[in-house]
Amino acid sequence: MIRAEQFSRLVQLREKQWPRFIILALIGFVVHLPSLQGQLVWDDSFLVRDNPFIKSPLFIFEAFRHYLFLDFYSAHYRPVQNLSFIADYFVWNGNLYGFHLTNLLLHIASGLLLYLLLGKLFSSLRGVEADNGNSSAWSLGAFFVALLWIVHPVHSAAVDYISGRADSLAFFFACAGWLLFIRARKSILLAARTALYSFAALSGLLALCSREIAFVWILLFLLHLTFFEKGLSRRAFFITVLCNIGLLGIYAGLRTLPEVLVSTTPSQGWPASMRAVLMLRSLGDYARLMVFPVNLHMERSVLAPENYLSHDQWRHSAGVEYLSILGLAFLGALIYGAFRAGPSRGLRIFGASWFLLGYLPISNLIELNATVAEHWLYLPSVGFLIFAIGCVLDLPVRYRGVLAGCACSAVVALGVSSTIRSSDWLTDEIFYRRTLAAGGRSSRVLANLGQACANRGEYAKAEAILRNVLRLSADYPIARRNLAEVLLREGHKKEAEELLTSTTKAAERTRKEYPLTWVAVLSLALSHHREKDDTKALAIAEKARHDYPGVWEIIRFESEVLRQTRGANAAIPLVDAFAHDNWWHYGAAIALGRLYAEKGDLPRAEAALRHASWLDVHDAEALSLIAAISLRQNRFEEAYRAQCRAVARQPDQPRQYVLLSNILEKMGRIGEARDALAEVALLKALGRDAPALAN
C-alpha cells in the first residue's frame, strides 16, 4: 500500500511542470556559467563597445533606421538586437557580465518557451493509437527535446558570444508569438482574444527584426496550421495567412528605412552543380555536429581549396568529401523516417520538415558569408531533435527506460562539452588561439590574433603572425595596416610607410572586396601628421573624406589637423555638417562643443554639449565640460548641478570629484569641497589596493 502511494506521488510529481522548468533553467545556467566572465571578442568591439546606437534610450526608434553594422557591407537588419543592447547598457553600463547574463537568460527563456510550445504542438501530432491515449511519454519527449536543445554545444556562438544573441532573440519572440496565438484561440472574451492576437503579431514582428531566420518560423507556423492543426475553420485559416502576409509587409517596409546599401563584394559565381555538392556537404556537417559535436570552432568551411596544397591537407580534405555522402545518407534517413508508418509518424514528418525548412536558408542554396556555421543550427536543431524523439517513441515500451538513461547520459556529455566550449570565449586571445587550433584558419582570425599580440606589446609575435596573414591574403587591408603599425613600433619607419602607401593606392581596388579600407588611408595621413607634414596629411584626409563619405574617424582627424594649423573656425564646418546629418553621434557632438568653446561661442558650445549629454547616459564628459563653462562664467549654481550629474554618472572617477570640489570652493561651501577631495583620496587608495587584492 505504501509502495503504491509512493509510486502515485512519483507519477504526480513527474506530471507537474514546475520541476521540469527548474531543471531546464538550472542546467542551462550551469553549462554556460564560464561565459559570464567573458570579455569583448570579435564583433563585440563594434556592436557593444563602439556602437553609437546603444548608449541612450533616445535611440529606440533610430535603431530601426540603420543596419546592424555601420561600416560593413552586410545588410543585417536587426534593430531588436540593438534595442536589447540599449537595455543592457542602461542597466549595466560597460559591465560585460550583464551583457553575458542577458544572453544566457535569453537562451534559457527560449528553451522554456520551446518546452511549452512543443507540449502544445505534440498533442496535434500524436496519432490516436499512440500510447493508447497516454500523453506522458510525449510530454517527456517534449521535455527532452528542450533539455537537449538547451545544453547542445553547437549553440555556443549564440549564447556565449554577446554579438550572437540575435538567434536567441528571434527564437524567443517567435516562440512567444506562437504560444500567444494558441492562447488567443482558447480565449472566450473578445477583448482578451484581440489583445492576445495583437501581442502575437507584435512578437512575430520583433522576431523578424531580431534576425532574418524568423521568416522560417512563419513558414513552420503556417505548415503546422495547414497540415497538422485540427479544429481551425477555413475562414480563420485564411485570416491567419493574411495577417502573416501583412506582418511580412510591415517588416519589408521597415527594411526600407536604412539607406540603401550597395554591396560591392564580388559574388562567388558558383555553378549549380557546385552548389548541390556544397548543400550535401553542409548537410553532412550539420548532421555530424548534432550527433558528435566535436572540434567546434568559428570560421568553419566545407569549401577550402587551400587544403590541397600538401599531402596532409589533402587527407584533411578527404574528410570534407565524405561529408557529401553523410549528407546524402542523412537526407535519406529523414525521408525514410517521414514515410515509415507508426504512431509517431506525424511527429517525424513535422521534425523533418522543421529541420529542412530551417536548413534551406543556410544550405548554400543562396550565397551567404560562409558555407557553414555552427550557430546557424539554433533553429534547425529543434527539428532534428523532434525527429529523433519521434523515432524513439515508436520503439517498444520496454526500451524506454534504457533510452531515457541514454538521453540523460547525452545531456551530461553535451553539457560538459558546452561548458568547455563556453570557456573559449573568455578573452579575445583565447578565442583566436583555440579557433586556429581547431581548424578555423582564416585570415581574419590570424589578423585579430596578431593585433591582440600587438596590444600586449609582443611586437615580434605580432609581426610574424601578420606577415603570415599577408602570405595567405596579400591584399587584406586591415592586416597590412596593423603590420605597418607594428613596424612603426619596432622602429622600421621606412618599411611601414611603404606598406601604408601601397595599401592606400590599392584601396580603390580592395574596397570592392574588403570593408574598412579607409583605416589604412587614415593611418598614412596620421603618419604624415606625426612627421609635421600637415599639408600632405590634409590632402590625404580630404581625398579620403570624399572617397569614404560619412566616416567620422576621417572627419575627426581632418578637423583636428585643421584646428591645430588654422584654428577652430576652419574645423567647425566639417564637424557641424557631420553632426547635423548624424544627430545621434556622441563623438561629433562633443567635438563640436569643444570647437565652439575654443572659438569663444559659449552658448553654442553649451547647446552642443547638452545635446551630447543626452546621447550617452553613462558618459560624463559633456556634463563636466558644461560645468567648466558655467564655472568660467561664474554661474556657480548651474555648474554645480551639471557636475553633480557628472558625478552620478561616474561615481568611481576621481577627476569628477576634483571639479566638484573646485565648484563648491567657489561657492563658499568649504566643508563640502573637502568632503569631495576626501572622496578623491579614497578612490585613489582603492585603486592602489585593487591590484594587491586581485593577486
List each model region and its residues.
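Polytopic membrane enzymes that build or remodel cell-surface glycoconjugates and lipids
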Residues: 1-491, 501, 506, 512, ...
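C-terminal luminal/periplasmic domains and tails of membrane-associated envelope-modifying transferases
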Residues: 2-14, 320, 429-695
